[in-house]
């Protein structure tokens, strides 16, 4: 059996129980036990004639206990009494007096039970039996009570005496309760008190009812007739106490019980009662006021409640008082109750009996129910300070003692035995137990021994020597051995030996010391924002032989993943907390535990964020509202772990701008109040928002609203302007005041104006709108203008004078051009002379320069004209036009403009010189042989002058020699050039540039490439084969730069012999650049092996299997193609195609023809957008945005996406423009025909078939 040591320590606390009784584990010995009373009747029993009376007395002991009773100190034998039934149950001496014989009165008295066996006698406490008869009210004659109105009266009750006080109720003959209040009330004695009587109290049936719960009966007193004599003059009188009647009294209160004090007063008007405790404050938590304050009940009386309690009765004429002097006393109570003990021979027995009470109780000792004087003849017992002491006890000294304490308030009794026994030593802990603990902890090896005398216990190691030589080993009195600071070498066997004068016994304990659990990486404290997530990591090392786990706690609570929430994610020693809130902050612990130990590592999480709402907004100093001020205060907001930097104070006017908040300012974060400067006539509702480094928090709840008084405006409108929108008027405008500056419910504006420089009378008008139109003015005349705010409280401050102007007219003068300076082929400077301001008819805003391209110098454009604009300020008389096309004609116009619009234009025409041409288009490399390449290209899109030819250069990309070779090609119409004597092992970089008469070479186009030998064996990229029922398609991607060649393709049916030789496909010649080949007339559902062969060298092979899913090539013999309907159908299609071709030819003829070299003259700006005449912006030129764009849909993109001819294009794309023949090795044996080449070279104006030297159409 393995004992987990961390659960052992609490067991040690129970070790004192060995002194109280023999352990249950001590088996095999018939141990005797002195009598112990287990149940007895209460100290006082009140019974009635019909009740059964049970007197209980039960006790345990070995041998069997015998019982006897005394009544009033005389031996009482229940079995011999008539009407008494004795309980025959084991361990019981109880008996019952049957109530149906009305014997209760005869059995009144004080009883005591004695339980005895040969070891001693136990004694019960005294049981007082009180028998009562049926309660009866004595016969009496009740006389009417006569009293004058306003006087006091007491109606007596005087119920029959009883051991159990009855409950009193006052009712009338109709069984209705007598209403009680401050004037009429019942005292604790049952009497009914009237502080003063009224005529309404005149009744003849005041009946006192007494309820006796013990007999379950209610008896009535004879009705009392209360006669009230009316009077016309009720005399006021000061209070007088009806109970108690004297000025003071003394009471004794028992500690722990309740104290009831009562004061009932009479007087007119009816007095009120209050209670005073002069020495100390009244203990309000234990005081109950009842009966309209006439009764004070003090609960759980203690010694501190000693002292004076005064009741004070008051009305308008005076007062009366009574002083209760309360003394707190106590019945006896235990400080230390004597306990039963087991002793061995020769030991000293001591029984302590410490009792307290007020007055101090008297303590007496009994032995086996007999007084000390009777049994202590040899003076063996002695009593010291209430304790009973016996020295050198022997088995014959076994006894049961009684300690009894008594004062006038009660008595206490306790039985305790001294049991002197002789028992052999026995170890109650199981033998050969295994204990496990971890290094560094404390192990507890148990050895619970029992015997009489108490055995001595010692621990030995495997060699039989005591273990106490090591200071880490410590034995406890209960036999347990503790080993602190455990080490791995403490593992082993230990022996516990217990011995007394009768025998000795030994048990074995096995100790295993394991590695202690350690946290190698604990969680680290973190500060995270609200809404973020945090990850805590924990790693630990464990003893490999123990089951281990890592768990997490948050503020001491175990954390677990919940299926209905993704708040926590726990896995592999990680704790992830999602969607952090402020409630998540706290201490988080990683707990690494085994069944033996656990270690914990803590980290603190702080959740930071914007502050919480500001609480407790309060307005004060409202008298300052007359000065448009108020004091606002608040309590600090929750800072959420980031100091509050400032508070933002905002207001809302629910009348003028509901749900819109305006800032009144900010105060430092350590300030929680401020006096606000307010505007007149605003309905203010305030709120405050706290701000820290993470931003503003939630706004506070809104404050109550306040309204400031009205006042005259303190501001005038700003941004006053005078401008005409017609030539004969002036529109005066201004920025209206915000409503919070009105200072009143409404606002108006007093507008004044007069011509500038003339001391004329101000013309004025008051308006509500933020504008005024002044009509019938002269064109562009200056005016002095003033605008003043006005409300029902007065005018605003004196306004400032603003100069405005009446309406403008169009300028009447055009700028005179001075000259045009040409900087280069794309930039010119245009200059003009300033215009006469008197002719502008308004404010000169600037000049508008308009220019547009008319065409190249060789040919003017007939296309849509796009105009570009530049706007320059009024103080500038020149403009730079940039981004122009070289070798082109331009038209320029300059106009002055004012607020009304543009004036007349000055015109000029100029031309730009030739410039550098653009780069040639579409440079392609075509392999001719392993040492030669054919280059072909297209001319530049932008000639920028007259082309004079091309400059071609190239050099190897790698290798030792990088000599640059140049070819000056002087024919501008040239489109191809053949290069020979190239090294087949090198890669070359080719560069081609165009030239003009005045510039060049221009921008270059660059390509890299080489001949076939550079790339070695041909590459069939992404080759694949697909099949139908009787055909197969082989497809591949020709490699870029690879020379074209021919090869055989052979389909061979598998297995051999499946297909007859007549149906075997014959080898076919295929060109590399054609990218695919289709083989027909294959057999369905047959596997074929495909071989690609060149000069008996296998280039590639693959397999394919035919099926029935594809189209079937049909033989012409007997097919539907010979049917008449099919021939007619094909003829109709051909006819339709001819008609379409004719229509297309007609349409192209109407569109005109143009050569490639003139394309730059006919380009159209597809994105051109004409500028509105009335729109003038910053300096800009749309020319540069659009001049260099391609033709749109008719020209290729210039972004490099065009594939070079001869790379991915197959020879089939060239149509009939080239005659090509191949030898067996794939080399060319023919040349381009002279006719085709001539047509291609001179076909720039046509859109005929594409050829290798005329790719214009192929680029589309």
Swiss-Prot record:
Recite the UniProt keywords alphabetically: Cell adhesion, Cell membrane, Cell projection, Developmental protein, Differentiation, Disulfide bond, Glycoprotein, Immunoglobulin domain, Membrane, Neurogenesis, Phosphoprotein, Repeat, Signal, Transmembrane, Transmembrane helix
For the region Disordered, give the residue spans: 697-724, 1183-1210, 1229-1260
Give every Ig-like C2-type domain span.
Answer: 35-130, 138-225, 239-327, 332-419, 424-506, 517-600
One of the GO biological process terms:
heterophilic cell-cell adhesion via plasma membrane cell adhesion molecules
What PROSITE patterns does its record include? FN3, IG_LIKE
**Which N-terminal stretch is annotated as signal sequence?**
1-19
Q: Where in the cell is it found?
A: Cell membrane; Cell projection, Growth cone
Q: Which residues carry this modification: Phosphoserine?
A: 1166, 1181, 1184, 1197, 1246-1247, 1251
What is its membrane topology?
A: Single-pass type I membrane protein
Q: Does the keyword tRNA processing apply?
A: no
Q: Which InterPro entries match?
A: FN3_dom, FN3_sf, Ig-like_dom, Ig-like_dom_sf, Ig-like_fold, Ig_I-set, Ig_sub, Ig_sub2
Question: Could you tell me which SMART domains the record lists for this protein?
Answer: FN3 (SM00060), IG (SM00409), IGc2 (SM00408)
Q: Which GO terms describe its molecular function?
A: identical protein binding; integrin binding; sialic acid binding
Listed Gene3D superfamilies: Immunoglobulins
The subunit structure is: Interacts with SHTN1; the interaction occurs in axonal growth cones. Interacts with isoform 2 of BSG.
**Record-stated family:** Belongs to the immunoglobulin superfamily. L1/neurofascin/NgCAM family.
Which function does this protein serve?
Neural cell adhesion molecule involved in the dynamics of cell adhesion and in the generation of transmembrane signals at tyrosine kinase receptors. During brain development, critical in multiple processes, including neuronal migration, axonal growth and fasciculation, and synaptogenesis. In the mature brain, plays a role in the dynamics of neuronal structure and function, including synaptic plasticity.
The protein depicted here goes by the name: Neural cell adhesion molecule L1
